[in-house]
Amino acid sequence: MSSHADSKPWTVPALAQAKRDGRKLVMLTAYDAGFARTFDANGVDLILVGDSLGMVVQGHESTLPVTTADMVYHTAAVARVLERALLVADLSFQADATPERALDAATQLLQAGAEMVKIEGAGHKLDVIRYLVEREIPVCSHLGLTPQSVLRFGGYKVQGRGEAGEQLRRDAQAAVDAGASLIVLECVPTPIAAQISAELRVPTIGIGAGPGCDGQVLVMHDMLGLDSGHRRPKFVKDFLAEGGSVAGAVQAYAQAVRDGSFPDAEHAYAA
């Protein structure tokens, strides 16, 4: 467990300080109090209540059916037990379609206990990010493979190869300029993710984006080797197999992120 996690709760400014200090950030999803409590006690710095709950908890084929009410319910359950980890919650599909709708949904999530909201995509979402930050709501920008755009992408595919990598770099910088305090990069080639991470002043969290990011996140079911009913992505590693228990798996995952052994080339995408 990191020295920070041993001493005091994480805050948004502390995330930027961790990047400056070269300290890797450990993030996991959680959707209920029991797992959240275990993750919080075993070295996880940030917990994401993700709309991935639509697939791994509710059994849907995508995240699209998840509602703001679903997100509020699970966010509140997780928030009640956290002592150190910073809590991030997703804005569900189309909850951020306009700045006003995003403010309503984000307000509900913060009232439920979230400390930051995550928004997928760039483009017109930059206005949403700016609108929320101007109203004192911390924002995480999710770029690369954005699951809410799965229909447009034609499936879950690596993003940012070739010329698209340069656009991804521009999108990441634009999100930070709009006020984002954290960037999630999903299914992005390792060299591009590393370049983006080096260029930005805020931390990047990778999921299938290689070891050059400032931290890593996995869906808890993937980290524990549970069958989610969907094809396992290349970047997934079962830490329960080596950890022997849920707490042991979390500790093994956290240590691997911090010492840089996860993700390795086997769990990342080349250019």
Curated annotation (Swiss-Prot):
One of its GO terms (cellular component) is cytoplasm. It is an enzyme of class 2 (transferase). It is found in: Cytoplasm. Signal peptide: none annotated. Pathway: Cofactor biosynthesis; (R)-pantothenate biosynthesis; (R)-pantoate from 3-methyl-2-oxobutanoate: step 1/2. The keyword Transferase applies. It catalyses: 3-methyl-2-oxobutanoate + (6R)-5,10-methylene-5,6,7,8-tetrahydrofolate + H2O = 2-dehydropantoate + (6S)-5,6,7,8-tetrahydrofolate. CDD domains: KPHMT-like. 3-methyl-2-oxobutanoate binds at D51, S52, D90, K118. Its EC number is 2.1.2.11. Keywords: Cytoplasm, Magnesium, Metal-binding, Pantothenate biosynthesis, Transferase. Its cofactor is Mg(2+). Mg(2+) binds at D51, D90, E120. Homodecamer; pentamer of dimers. This is 3-methyl-2-oxobutanoate hydroxymethyltransferase. It comes from Xanthomonas campestris pv. campestris (strain ATCC 33913 / DSM 3586 / NCPPB 528 / LMG 568 / P 25). The gene is panB.
